Structure formats: C-alpha cells, structure tokens
Amino acid sequence: GGCCSHPACAANNQDYC
C-alpha cells in the first residue's frame, strides 16, 4: 500500500518499491 500502490510515486521510488 501507500506510495508503492501509486505508479507515479513508485516510479520515483524504484529503489524502495
């Protein structure tokens, strides 16, 4: 859930997601 559930956010956090 959270950021990793949102493509735009996940794309900016690939190191975490």
UniProtKB/Swiss-Prot annotation:
In the record, Sulfotyrosine modifications are located at Y16
InterPro entries reported in the protein's UniProt record:
Conotoxin_a-typ_CS
Q: Where is this region: Ser-Xaa-Pro motif, crucial for potent interaction with nAChR?
A: 5-7
Compartments, record wording: Secreted
Q: Which UniProt keywords apply?
A: Acetylcholine receptor inhibiting toxin, Amidation, Disulfide bond, Ion channel impairing toxin, Neurotoxin, Postsynaptic neurotoxin, Secreted, Sulfation, Toxin
Specify the domain of life of the species encoding this protein: Eukaryota
Its post-translational modification remark reads: C-terminal amidation, in synergy with sulfation, is important for activity and structure stability. Non-amidated conotoxins has a 1.9-fold lower inhibitory potency on alpha-3-beta-2/CHRNA3-CHRNB2 nAChRs (IC(50)=0.54 nM), and a 4.8-fold lower inhibitory potency on alpha-7/CHRNA7 nAChRs (IC(50)=367 nM), when compared to sulfated conotoxin. Sulfation at Tyr-16, in synergy with amidation, is important for activity and structure stability. Non-sulfated conotoxin has a 2.3-fold lower inhibitory potency on alpha-3-beta-2/CHRNA3-CHRNB2 nAChRs (IC(50)=0.64 nM), and a 11-fold lower inhibitory potency on alpha-7/CHRNA7 nAChRs (IC(50)=836 nM), when compared to sulfated conotoxin.
Gene Ontology, cellular component aspect: extracellular region; host cell postsynaptic membrane
The entry lists its GO molecular-function terms as: acetylcholine receptor inhibitor activity; ion channel regulator activity; toxin activity
| Disulfide bridge positions per record | C3-C9, C4-C17
Q: Does the keyword Translocase apply?
A: no
Is this entry keyworded Secreted? Answer: yes
Q: What is this protein's tissue specificity according to the annotation?
A: Expressed by the venom duct.
- Cysteine amide is found on C17
**Which family is it part of?**
Belongs to the conotoxin A superfamily.
Domain text: The cysteine framework is I (CC-C-C). Alpha4/7 pattern.
What's the protein here called? Alpha-conotoxin AnIB
